[in-house]
C-alpha cells in the first residue's frame, strides 16, 4: 500500500509538526509505503505551488491514498487527485467551537468529496454533526520515557525549593492563551511557584521538562486532541487543563488531573493549587496504554481504515 502524507510544513522549510512525523514513522513501521509531502508557505500562492507539486507526485507514484492533515490540506489533496482514482483521507485536527463558514465547507467536503475523514475527539464529530471515526494522535512511549524527577530537575536547571508549572507552547500564539496562564499563577500569590513556558525544544528536552515539572498547564481556547496532555500523562506529570477537545476523556478523572472551564482564572488557580498539594506523580502512563493511545496502537487503527478504501 502506497500513501502520500500531506501536512503543513511551516514549522521550518520542509519540516512538519512533530506529531505528524511521529504518525508517519509509526505507519512505516506497520509496513505502509509512506511518502511525506510538506506544504511550505502561507496563502493561496503557496497552496497553488503545492498543488502543482502534489499533482506531479501523484502522477509519478500512483499512490493508493493521499492522507491529508488539516482541512485545508484536504482541499489541496482533493484538487490534486481529482482526475485519477486515488483515494483521499483527511484528519481534522482542530475543533469548531462555534458555527462558521469553515464548519459548513468542511461538512460539504466530508459528505461529498473526501473518501474518508477522521477526527481527533468526539467533541469535533459532534460539532460537525456527522458520525465519524475518532482516532486521537498517539504518544511514542519510547520517546517519552520516564526520567527520575530529581534528575530531570537538575538537568532542567530548576531551583531547589521552587515549584514549576510548565506551559508548552510559544507565548505569542494567541489561541493558547498564555496571559490566562499568567493570571492564574499570579492569583496563587506564591513567589515559590514558577510559570515556565517551554517552546522551540526537541522532544528529547521536552520529556525532561515534563518529568521535572510539578504541573503541566494547558489554557487553550480550543483544541482537537492536545498532544501535550497525553505526553505529560506519559511522563506521569500532574495536569491542569481547560475543557477542550478530548481532555475530559483522556484524563478520565485520574488522580492528579484537573479539567476546568475555559476562561475561569480563579478555577485554574485553585486547580493548580490542588495539583501542587497533590505533590506526587500520577498513573497517567498506564492510562495512555489502557486507552490505546500509543503511536503504534493509533497507527494500527489508521491502517485499518486505509484497508477499507
Locate the predicted segments by residue:
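Conserved donor-binding/catalytic core segment of Leloir-type glycosyltransferases
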Residues: 158-176, 182-185
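Acidic anion/phosphate-binding donor-loop and adjacent secondary structure
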Residues: 139-155, 309
Amino acid at each position: 500500500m502506497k500513501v502520500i502524507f500531506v501536512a503543513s510544513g511551516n514549522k521550518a522549510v520542509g519540516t512538519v509538526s512533530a506529531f505528524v512525523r511521529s504518525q508517519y514513522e509509526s505507519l512505516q513501521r506497520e509496513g505502509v509505503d509512506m511518502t511525506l509531502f510538506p506544504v511550505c508557505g502561507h496563502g493561496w500562492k503557496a497552496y497553488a505551488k503545492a498543488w502543482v507539486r502534489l499533482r506531479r507526485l501523484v502522477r509519478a507514484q500512483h499512490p493508493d491514498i493521499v492522507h491529508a492533515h488539516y482541512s485545508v490540506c484536504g482541499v489541496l489533496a482533493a484538487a490534486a487527485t481529482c482526475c485519477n482514482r486515488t483515494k483521499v483521507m483527511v484528519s481534522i485536527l482542530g475543533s469548531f467551537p462555534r458555527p462558521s463558514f469553515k464548519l459548513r465547507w468542511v461538512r460539504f467536503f466530508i459528505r461529498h468529496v473526501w473518501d474518508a475523514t477522521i477526527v481527533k475527539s468526539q467533541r469535533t464529530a459532534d460539532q460537525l454533526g456527522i458520525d465519524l471515526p475518532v482516532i486521537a494522535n498517539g504518544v511514542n512511549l519510547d520517546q517519552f520515557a520516564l526520567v527520575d524527577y530529581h534528575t530531570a530537575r537538575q538537568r532542567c536547571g530548576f531551583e531547589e525549593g521552587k515549584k514549576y508549572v510548565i506551559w508548552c507552547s510559544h507565548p505569542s500564539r494567541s489561541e493558547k492563551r498564555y496571559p490566562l496562564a499568567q493570571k492564574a499563577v499570579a492569583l496563587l500569590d506564591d513567589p515559590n511557584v514558577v510559570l515556565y513556558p517551554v517552546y522551540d525544544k526537541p522532544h528529547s528536552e521536552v520529556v525532561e521538562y515534563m518529568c521535572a515539572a510539578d504541573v503541566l498547564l494547558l489554557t487553550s481556547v480550543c483544541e482537537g486532541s492536545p498532544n501535550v496532555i497525553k505526553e505529560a500523562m506519559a511522563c506521569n506529570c500532574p495536569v491542569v487543563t481547560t475543557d477542550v477537545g478530548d481532555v475530559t476523556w483522556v484524563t478520565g478523572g485520574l488522580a492528579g488531573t484537573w479539567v476546568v472551564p475555559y476562561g475561569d482564572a480563579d478555577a485554574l488557580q485553585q486547580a493548580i493549587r490542588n495539583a501542587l498539594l497533590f505533590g506526587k506523580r500520577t498513573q497517567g502512563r498506564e492510562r495512555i496504554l489502557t486507552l490505546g493511545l500509543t503511536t503504534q496502537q493509533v497507527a494500527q487503527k489508521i491502517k485499518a481504515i486505509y484497508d477499507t478504501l
